[in-house]
Amino acid sequence: MNAPDKLATLLSLTREPFPASRKSYLQGSRSDLRVPMREVTLTNGETVSLYDTSGPYTEPGVAIDVRRGLPSVRTPWLDERADTEVYAGRLHQALDDGAKHEDREAERIEQLRLDAAALQRPPRRARAGANVTQMHYARRGIVTPEMEYVALRENGKREWMREYLGDAPREQRLRGNPMGAQIPAIVTPEFVRDEVARGRAIIPANINHPEVEPMAIGRNFLVKINANIGNSAVTSSIEEEVEKLVWAIRWGADNVMDLSTGRNIHTTRDWILRNSPVPIGTVPIYQALEKVGGVAEDLTWAIFRDTLIEQAEQGVDYFTIHAGVRLPFIHLTADRRTGIVSRGGSIMAKWCISHHRESFIYEHFEDICDIMKAYDVSFSLGDGLRPGSAADANDEAQFAELRTLGELTQVAWKHDVQTMIEGPGHVPMHMIQANMDEQLKHCHEAPFYTLGPLTIDIAPGYDHIASAIGAAMIGWFGTAMLCYVTPKEHLGLPDREDVKQGIVAYKIAAHAADVAKGHPGARARDDALSKARFEFRWMDQFNLSLDPDTARDFHDETLPKDASKVAHFCSMCGPKFCSMKITQEVRDYAAQRGVSEAQALGAGMAEKSSQFRQAGGEIYIPLAVDKG
C-alpha cells in the first residue's frame, strides 16, 4: 500500500462521530462564518451542545482527502482585507528535511514529499508597510471575522443550559472565584477585540493557515489545552504524526505543537498543517539544529531566520522562541538538582557559553518581530530555564527568565505581535500560585501557557495525573492554556493511546478550572450528566462524559447486557443499596402521600420502627429455610 493510502486508512479510524452526537453550526453575520459545535442527543429528548475541536473529521457527510487538505475557511476573509500578497516563497531544500534516509525509506518518503508539495499553497505575506496581526486590527478598532468566530465559539448554544442554571439560590451558593479574571456573562466580538488589543488574549491564526478554525487563548476565556506530537530521531513516521493530530483534536486538543526533532521535519509539517483545523505551534530551533547537523555551536542568525520564514510560509501559527535564555542567567542553574531540562533552553545555553555572548535570538528579537507581523505568527515565549524537578521550583533562574520574557512581551507588543508566555514545569502545590502571581506581575497579563506543572516527581508512568493536579490549580489561578503531559512523559515518545490519556486528563483539569472560576455555563454539562445519573439514563451518562468509550467499557465489564443500560443500579452497590434508587423511592413515597420528603423520611422511619418491634426487637432474625 502506498503512503497516501496508508494515511487515508489511518484517518478512517477516527472519523466516526461520538455516540449520539452530530455536528451543528452557529451562524455568524456572514454566510461563510459558521462555527461548529457538537450536539449530544439524550434519551429523554434533551440536546446538549458542546465546544468542538474535531474539525470536519467527525462529520460523516464531509469528504476528507489528506492529499488535498481541509477547506480553506479563512481565504475569503484574507482576500477582503487586501493587505497581503501571494508570492513565490522560498524553495523547499533537502536540508529542510534533515539527513538522508535509509534506502528502504527513500521511495515512501519521496512519495510523501511529492504529495506534500501538492498540498502546499503559494504563501502569503503582508504587503510592504502592512501589519496583518489580529492585535494590529484590534488596536485599530476593527472586529475581524476571526474575532466574531471566537465570540460565537466561546458562548456556544446557551438555550439548553437554562434548566440547569436557572436556580438562583443554588447558583449563588456554587458561584466560582475568578481569581481576578474578568469573565463576561456573554462574550461579544467587541470583547474579543478588546482582549486581543490589550494583549490579554491571542488568536493564533497565521495567514498561511487558512484551514484553521479560529480560537482564543486568554485568561477571560475558556481554559484551553495543547497536545504535543512529532517524530524523533529514533521513532515515529509521518503517517503516525498525522493520525495523532486527528486523534488529538477528536479528544479535545485546542492546539497542537509539532515537536519533530528527527528527519522529514518540513514534510511532516506540510502534512500536519494542511490537515489541521486547530492552530499548530513549533519550536523552530529544533529544525535549525538539524540544519547544522545537531551542533548547537554552529547555529547562526541567518540559519534561524531562514527557518522562521520557512515555517511561517508553511502556516505555523505560533513559535516557541527561547529568547529569555540569556548569558547572565545560565550560571544560576549550576546548583540545580536537574539543571536545564528544556531542549530549546539547553541548545541556546550551550550556544551562549560557546560564543560567550548573548544569544542571537535575544539580540535579533526585533528582527524576529518583523517576521512575525508579516505572517501573523504568535510568540510563545519559551521558558528555557523552567524547573525540571520540584527541588528547583521558583528559583532565581526561573524568575530571572520570566522577568526578561515580560520585557520582551512589551517589545513584541510595540510591533503588534500577539504573545503568550510559557511556564513550568515541576512545582509543588503550595508554590503554584506564586508562579501565576509572578507572571501577572511581570508579563502584563499576557496569556500564560504552562506545562502542567507536575506537583511531584515520583510518578513516572502516571505523570499525566501528577501534572493534571497542578494544571487544574494553575488554570484556576489564571493560566490560559495547559500543555498536556502523557503517561510516557520522561519515558518515551507517546503513542495514540498515550495521547488520548494525556488529553482526557487535561480536559478534566481545564474543565475543573473553568468551573472553579465560575465561567458561565461551564457547570451545565456536569449537571446534565448528574441528572442522567440520578435518573439511571446510562447511555446519556456515557455520552456526556469526556470519554464515552471508556465509561461504557468499564460499566460493561460487570454489567454487559443491554438490559443493564436501563437498570436502576450499578455493580458498585447492587440493586438493594443504590443510594440514588433509595432517594428516588423516598421521593415517590412522598409524592404518593402528598407530603414533603422530610415528612416521608419520618413516616418511613416510624414504619420500620414498628416492623422491628413486631418482629420481636431482635437485631438478627433467622432466615426461613425452604425444606422442600
Curated annotation (Swiss-Prot):
E.C. number, please?
4.1.99.17
Pathway(s): Cofactor biosynthesis; thiamine diphosphate biosynthesis
User: Which one GO biological process term can you cite for this protein?
Assistant: thiamine biosynthetic process
**UniProt-annotated binding residues for substrate:** N228, M257, Y286, H322, S342, R343, G344, D383, G384, L385, R386, E422, Y449
**Free-text comment on the cofactor:** Binds 1 [4Fe-4S] cluster per subunit. The cluster is coordinated with 3 cysteines and an exchangeable S-adenosyl-L-methionine.
The record's top EC class is lyase
Q: Does the keyword Oxidoreductase apply?
A: no
Catalyzed reactions per annotation: 5-amino-1-(5-phospho-beta-D-ribosyl)imidazole + S-adenosyl-L-methionine = 4-amino-2-methyl-5-(phosphooxymethyl)pyrimidine + CO + 5'-deoxyadenosine + formate + L-methionine + 3 H(+)
Give a Gene Ontology cellular component term annotated to this protein: cytosol
Cofactors (names): [4Fe-4S] cluster
Q: Which residues are involved in binding [4Fe-4S] cluster?
A: C570, C573, C578
Which keywords are on file for this protein? 4Fe-4S, Iron, Iron-sulfur, Lyase, Metal-binding, S-adenosyl-L-methionine, Thiamine biosynthesis, Zinc
Q: Which InterPro entries match?
A: ThiC, ThiC-associated_dom, ThiC/Bza_core_dom, ThiC/BzaA/B
Q: Which GO terms describe its molecular function?
A: 4 iron, 4 sulfur cluster binding; carbon-carbon lyase activity; zinc ion binding
Q: How does it assemble?
A: Homodimer.
Stated family:
Belongs to the ThiC family.
Protein function: Catalyzes the synthesis of the hydroxymethylpyrimidine phosphate (HMP-P) moiety of thiamine from aminoimidazole ribotide (AIR) in a radical S-adenosyl-L-methionine (SAM)-dependent reaction.
NCBIfam families listed in its UniProt record: PRK09284.1, PRK13352.1, thiC
Q: What's the protein here called?
A: Phosphomethylpyrimidine synthase
Q: Which gene encodes it?
A: thiC
